[in-house]
Amino acid sequence: MAQTSKYKRVVLKLSGEALAGDKGFGINPIIIKSVAQQVAEVAKMDCEIAVIVGGGNIWRGKTGSDLGMDRGTADYMGMLATVMNALALQDSLEQLDCDTRVLTSIEMKQVAEPYIRRRAIRHLEKKRVVIFAAGIGNPYFSTDTTAALRAAEVEADVILMGKNNVDGVYSADPKVDANAIKYEHLTHIQMLQEGLQVMDSTASSFCMDNNIPLNVFSIMEEGNIKRAVMGEKIGTLITK
């Protein structure tokens, strides 16, 4: 019996740290293969999937800025880090015979296609996995904001936020506070008012204004992407 997706089109947001695994830096080949297998499994269902990968496993713009670098330069370096991650994920997906396209906000024709909204949608309609890289092409904006913007542009039904060190949204850091409560459901306004660190406030406000749901869950548990796509109750669901 064919497995049915709850959503027609999803955006999967992965932090760069999720690809690093326990090492905290670089790309862990075991982790990226696991993520690719999960994404490929979803792509075979009746669900179109786009992926946005952060670059924190290689470089963080804020880190460079804190060290005295020009913030714009540091952020552009971070965008290039996301391209490295995107190409690594594309390679892992193509090894699984999963048709994949990388689209970058900064033009680099030799390695990827330039981001064009209509082209991205067409790739999704053709059941290709689309990986968005290089953020939105401007400094001062996070990859969380990229996920929110691209989800609105391609009219995704939900943003799936795969985390590497937490299995949902908590009232406090569960590693520090033993009394921290895990939320099964939140609203965007609650998330903003309570200062819950799901994504930055720019991205959170954008999701609220454009009525984009979020599902926050652990990427480290095998099969969780598929479970989220099928509508199983995992992690924390955030809606308007």
From Swiss-Prot:
Keywords linked to the UniProt accession: Allosteric enzyme, ATP-binding, Cytoplasm, Kinase, Nucleotide-binding, Pyrimidine biosynthesis, Transferase
Region (Involved in allosteric activation by GTP) residue spans: 21-26
GO CC entries: cytoplasm
Keyword NADP: no
Activity regulation summary: Allosterically activated by GTP. Inhibited by UTP.
EC number assigned by the record: 2.7.4.22
Keyword Glycoprotein annotated: no
Signal peptide positions on this chain: none
Localization terms from the record: Cytoplasm
Gene Ontology terms: biological process: 'de novo' CTP biosynthetic process; UDP biosynthetic process
Residues engaged in binding UMP: 55, 75, 136-143
Biological role: Catalyzes the reversible phosphorylation of UMP to UDP.
Subunit structure and binding partners: Homohexamer.
Protein name (Swiss-Prot/TrEMBL): Uridylate kinase
GO molecular-function term, one example from the UniProt record: UMP kinase activity
Residues binding ATP, per UniProt: 13-16, 56, 60, 164, 170, 173
Catalysed reactions, as listed in the record: UMP + ATP = UDP + ADP
Organism: Staphylococcus epidermidis (strain ATCC 35984 / DSM 28319 / BCRC 17069 / CCUG 31568 / BM 3577 / RP62A)
Entry similarity comment: Belongs to the UMP kinase family.
Pathway the protein contributes to: Pyrimidine metabolism; CTP biosynthesis via de novo pathway; UDP from UMP (UMPK route): step 1/1
One Pfam family of this chain: AA_kinase
Gene3D superfamilies: Acetylglutamate kinase-like
